[in-house]
């Protein structure tokens, strides 16, 4: 079901699209993770020792061993990370399965294993594991990039890349002292875009943007700091920002959204072309994406796309990436009988923000099944936009589409532990139902008080 036909050593863009396949060149990416519960899963039974002996027998190097209380069966479960290139892992897996009541394989490099689930982060700190696997690094610019022949700009890009590369979850977001030239570039973009927002941006965007001006220093002569913006978003919807040096693979980027984490660049486009950038920069992130991550309905919609991606086969990752492109990046919606822009690619581009509401592009209703297989250009204005009636209806349609993804489990984000729960057993479902019942009782109590 999950078998990949082709693997790439590094994140690789597929054809002329925004879809980027993750790479497996680093040692950690080639490891195989095993999650299992021995038939006798009490810690005192010696069951784990027996299973570890199996790995030793087949010369498997284990790089991580973790025990935890199981939500699937009474007792404990174990999470083991094995070096996929050592020993006879296939034979070891067959022997371990015989000793277990529950067994699951999770692998980053799964092209030769049709039974493996593509690896995905379970805890928010797991985002550290792929945050630096990007399409290009720092000063590595394409020959047609405006800053390709500018040594100072390339040096500056490396500075930003190093900041992101060294960041770990839980640390304060790095403060950046932007240069006068960088602030002037930001100012040109800010000044032009804000002229169009009242007439072209959606209602939710125009509600949040003044709050960013008041609370986060959004103004023409100042580039906001990610830490200030992230704290603001956390208070609004629980979304946070995380610095990244460049484009992540589609699978890794979407996985961040499942935790309400948005990977954001801090560098800015080259000053020679302030109204153009061939890649996401801090202007695109802050002017385009950030305002709507402060809206509860849009935040939930974005997280649903992320949750749908966890453990999904490659072809569905491409579909979800395309849905993201036509919504979060280039989405248009209907409000009070008029078309308004809500996609970040539109809200951070003066030219395309003007263009998208004219009669030049084609418009179609947003339907994930159709949207997810639509081809699109990445170096010119979009000839087609998908129109959503509301973020709420877009979310419901996306959830329905996610139910068609062939994976043998459901997922749920636990905001208390900032972790993803894999729902694949009756005890887990029962526990979830108890939680829902408790929330429903709170709702009933609140409604009763409103009636008094």
From Swiss-Prot:
Molecular functions per Gene Ontology: iron ion binding; phenylalanine 4-monooxygenase activity; tryptophan 5-monooxygenase activity
UniProt binding sites for Fe cation: 284, 289, 329
Catalysis: reaction(s): (6R)-L-erythro-5,6,7,8-tetrahydrobiopterin + L-phenylalanine + O2 = (4aS,6R)-4a-hydroxy-L-erythro-5,6,7,8-tetrahydrobiopterin + L-tyrosine; (6R)-L-erythro-5,6,7,8-tetrahydrobiopterin + L-tryptophan + O2 = 5-hydroxy-L-tryptophan + (4aS,6R)-4a-hydroxy-L-erythro-5,6,7,8-tetrahydrobiopterin
Cofactor field: Fe(2+)
Pfam families: Biopterin_H (PF00351)
Residue list for modification Phosphoserine: 272
Keyword Phosphoprotein annotated: yes
InterPro entries with a match to the protein in the record: ACT-like_dom_sf, ACT_dom, ArAA_hydroxylase, ArAA_hydroxylase_Fe/CU_BS, ArAA_hydroxylase_sf, Aro-AA_hydroxylase_C_sf, Aromatic-AA_hydroxylase_C, Euk_PheOH_cat
Anything else known: In Drosophila, the 2 enzymes, PAH and TRH are found to be encoded by the same gene. Preference for the substrate is probably due to post-translational modifications such as phosphorylation, or by changes in the N-terminal regulatory domain.
Name of the featured protein: Protein henna
Lineage: Eukaryota, Metazoa, Ecdysozoa, Arthropoda, Hexapoda
